[in-house]
Amino acid sequence: MSKEKFERTKPHVNVGTIGHVDHGKTTLTAAITTVLAKTYGGAARAFDQIDNAPEEKARGITINTSHVEYDTPTRHYAHVDCPGHADYVKNMITGAAQMDGAILVVAATDGPMPQTREHILLGRQVGVPYIIVFLNKCDMVDDEELLELVEMEVRELLSQYDFPGDDTPIVRGSALKALEGDAEWEAKIIELAGFLDSYIPEPERAIDKPFLLPIEDVFSISGRGTVVTGRVERGIIKVGEEVEIVGIKETQKSTCTGVEMFRKLLDEGRAGENVGVLLRGIKREEIERGQVLAKPGTIKPHTKFESEVYILSKDEGGRHTPFFKGYRPQFYFRTTDVTGTIELPEGVEMVMPGDNIKMVVTLIHPIAMDDGLRFAIREGGRTVGAGVVAKVLG
């Protein structure tokens, strides 16, 4: 089994299918695994294996998602597909399946439909950086002009939401015909895989990003100073480096004088590791859970932002009643709750359980944040919603 070992050295990229119901997302997912397995090796997955997606929980929300994997000669892909529209909304907002790029499936027989638009908008709001289009069911359209018209509509729609519509790769194919083994249409799946390789850049690994550690706990160690603990979210912290303590209070500077893990002293702490960081000249009471340690200048505290949120339905353990403007829940960021007020979009009077909505949030304390940060909405410790920072406002 030397092949397995070899795969690990390939860059790993996360993708997923998005688009309107019944436009062929799951069929395309099956076709990609089947055609690539046949061409480059790997395991094919049948349509029905993908379609009955298992339930998973992300931030207390139940989502049905199918995960498949496939390889091209240069990369390894993890691919998510969701059976229902609501699952997509939840998946994208919670970031349960973070996508480095998405394949937008549009049936040539229908053209763009309401969920096509909604998924593109969600992609923009939650920070899906790249979209490739698969124009499906092209075997059912004889009219070249009609295909060109649909293509133009899709490009315009992408441009409307700030994706580069004119430069977006569009593949004309038939997922069903490819799945049935028709060579002409199989070639279109290979073409799509080629665009995944060339159009979606290799994602930056967490370890290569600037250092950030959400503070979970603070201890005072007599004779040594103050230690904060938490899991390094990204980057590397080395002994002797300057750090900033950001959020809740005024930003403070300090120097890391020690890193420890499992009571052992280390030279550095890396993304994914649970560590204690010893800070010079900081008193125990000057720092608290909910702040972050970060590489100086890389993240700022903010109180106001535009967000895209999903409100849990009653069945999911959420609220039983709608809420209105002036609603003041807690927003849970990384390790702490902060109270905030909301502004609803113009013309929206109330939000029902099960809805997804754009809202502007103003927090009572600043939190270290960037666009794309995920949060939960809570009432008295119970999760009632999930959201993502679409745009920091102040």
Curated annotation (Swiss-Prot):
Modified residues (Phosphothreonine): 383
Residues holding GTP: 19-26, 81-85, 136-139
Metal-binding among keywords: yes
Segments for region (G4): 136-139
Pfam family, one: GTP_EFTU_D3
Residue ranges of the region described as G2: 60-64
GO biological process, any: translational elongation
A single GO molecular function term of this UniProt record: GTPase activity
UniProt modified residues of type N6,N6-dimethyllysine: 57
Residue numbers spanned by region G5: 174-176
Residue segments, region G1: 19-26
Principal localisation: cytoplasm
PROSITE patterns per record: G_TR_1, G_TR_2
Subcellular locations according to the entry: Cytoplasm
Segments traversing the membrane: none
tr-type G domain location: 10-204
GO annotation, cellular component aspect: cytoplasm
Family the UniProt entry places it in: Belongs to the TRAFAC class translation factor GTPase superfamily. Classic translation factor GTPase family. EF-Tu/EF-1A subfamily.
Main function: GTP hydrolase that promotes the GTP-dependent binding of aminoacyl-tRNA to the A-site of ribosomes during protein biosynthesis.
Summary of subunit composition and partner proteins: Monomer.
Protein name: Elongation factor Tu
Organism: Salmonella typhimurium (strain LT2 / SGSC1412 / ATCC 700720)
Lineage, uppermost ranks: Bacteria, Pseudomonadati, Pseudomonadota, Gammaproteobacteria, Enterobacterales
Gene name in the database record: tufA
